[in-house]
A protein has these predicted regions:
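Short cysteine/histidine-rich metal-coordination sites, predominantly Zn2+-binding motifs
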Residues: 56-62, 72-81
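N-terminal pre-ligand scaffold of iron-sulfur
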Residues: 1-55, 66-67, 80-101
Length: 101
C-alpha cells in the first residue's frame, strides 16, 4: 500500500514540512541526501516536535532528537529513546508512505 504525502519539491532543503497522516502528523525532511519521514511525536511525553537548527525539539519539556538517527540528544527523554520513522519512497516526484516495507 502506498499513500502520497507530498511532492518531492514541497520538502524544504533545510527544516521540515509537517503534514497530516491518518489523524496524526509527520515531519517530512531531507537528511543525509535523502527524504525521511518521522512521526511528529516526542517519545518523552507525546508532545509535538519543532524542527530547530538541525534537531527536533519538543516545546513542552525541551527533549531534543538528532534528525539523522532519531536518537535523543538532550532534555528529559531517555538517552536510549528514538523517534519513530515511517517507511517512505520518492517515486515520480512524489513522497509516498509505503506500508509493510
Amino acid at each position: 500500500m502506498r499513500h502520497r504525502l507530498c511532492a518531492e519539491s514541497d520538502v524544504p532543503e533545510s527544516g521540515s514540512i509537517v503534514l497530516p497522516f491518518f489523524g496524526r502528523e509527520v515531519h517530512v525532511y531531507r537528511s543525509g541526501g535523502r527524504i525521511r519521514v518521522a512521526a511528529n511525536v516526542c517519545v518523552h511525553f507525546g508532545g509535538p516536535l519543532e524542527c530547530k537548527d538541525g534537531s527536533f525539539v519538543c516545546p513542552w519539556h525541551g527533549a531534543s532528537y538528532d534528525m539523522d538517527s532519531g536518537r535523543a540528544t538532550g532534555g528529559p527523554a531517555r538517552k536510549d529513546a528514538q523517534l519513530m520513522f515511517l517507511s517512505s519512497r520518492v517515486e515520480n516526484g512524489d513522497v509516498n508512505y509505503v506500508w509493510g516495507e
